[in-house]
Swiss-Prot record:
One of its GO terms (molecular function) is ribosome binding. Coiled coil: none annotated. PANTHER family: RIBOSOME MATURATION FACTOR RIMM. The keyword Cytoplasm applies. Residues 110-189 form the PRC barrel domain. InterPro entries: PRC_barrel-like_sf, PRC_RimM, RimM, RimM_N, RimM_N_sf, Transl_B-barrel_sf. An accessory protein needed during the final step in the assembly of 30S ribosomal subunit, possibly for assembly of the head region. Essential for efficient processing of 16S rRNA. May be needed both before and after RbfA during the maturation of 16S rRNA. It has affinity for free ribosomal 30S subunits but not for 70S ribosomes. It comes from the Bacteria. Belongs to the RimM family. One of its GO terms (biological process) is ribosomal small subunit biogenesis. It holds the Pfam family PRC_RimM. It comes from Blochmanniella pennsylvanica (strain BPEN). This is Ribosome maturation factor RimM.
Length: 189
């Protein structure tokens, strides 16, 4: 191993979180003192700092990391990770996802949903037509939008369908037990 890579000691290797959820990503080094630039995937960008512990995967090994400091520089956050003391070590962490266990998420009301819970759900219309699976969700200023990968043999001959996440108007029912979302939507729209 090179001296300038982030090192993994045998005693640092740990059991990964039982229910891992990616909440951000290290996108590169910042400066020469081991700071890293991060991208937050949380609804409010600074919510990423309300969790602990954090995990990353380095060289196919789970590693718990500790954030000693963080700062907002422009519109991006920089973070000082304990044990990362130079630019090369920081750069070796580029593209590592920042992971927590989902048990750290706050409890939510019955009519609220985490995006992670909707990904993979099957989408059907109120007429009972199977559209496909939710593969991602796009956040917009007006409303969120479900990206549905359509079934291969769909009648509409389209690959993906965008469905506005409008409860009651378009989204008629969400059942996380059966992993189904019922919509009143015409994919040709």
């Amino acid at each position: 191993m090179k001296h300038d890579e982030y090192s993994i000691n045998k005693e640092d290797v740990m059991i990964p979180p039982l229910h891992p959820v990616v909440i951000g990503r290290i996108i590169g080094a910042y400066g020469i003192l081991g700071w890293v630039r991060i991208l937050s995937f949380t609804e409010k960008n600074d919510n990423i700092f309300y969790y602990s512990p954090y995990f990353i995967i380095v060289q196919s090994t789970w590693k718990e990391i500790f954030l000693d400091k963080w700062k907002l520089i422009g519109k991006r956050y920089i973070v000082k990770i304990r044990g990362v003391s130079n630019r090369n070590s920081a750069q070796s962490l580029s593209r590592c996802n920042i992971i927590i266990d989902e048990t750290q998420f706050p409890c939510i009301n019955d009519d609220e949903y985490y995006w992670k819970d909707l990904i993979g759900c099957v989408v059907i219309t109120v007429q009972g037509v199977l559209l496909g699976d939710i593969i991602s969700i796009i956040e917009t200023t007006a409303n969120d939008v479900l990206v549905v990968k359509m079934c291969q043999n769909n009648l509409y001959k389209i690959k993906n369908c965008l469905i506005p996440f409008l409860i009651k108007r378009v989204i008629k029912n969400i059942n996380l037990v059966t992993r189904t979302v019922t919509v009143d939507w015409d994919p040709n729209f």
